[in-house]
Amino acid sequence: MNKHNSAQYGDLTVLYRPVGRIELDLIQRSGLKAFPPRLEGQPIFYPVLNEEYATFIAREWNTKDAASGYIGYVLRFSVRKDFLDHFEVQKVGSSTALEYWIPAEKLREFNENIVGVIEVIAHHQNQS
């Protein structure tokens, strides 16, 4: 673990991303290798640094959002550390609310720095 609680393995950093059904479908179409382009009005891509925070978002936000299909998935993936070194970690709340802010125009380069596949490690559904 580094000072931000994300796991590092050599030159890789493990990141997480909470997503809804539509975004997961688009990721699966890439062969679980890339995130889809941001939509208009979404200038930033937000991967998070720990599973706890990703789970919170997937469970508390995605499951209450019609655009997410009322389901939240937690994804795990590895990114080359030398690419991430160009971005600062942003703390957006509690000590676990840590994320990178990747400009939409850098998402293609971000995807090129993913090593391996994007894994679905959990899902949460609206129980109401």
Give short role names for the model-derived ranges.
Residues 1-46, 52-128:
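Conserved NAD+-utilizing ADP-ribose enzyme module
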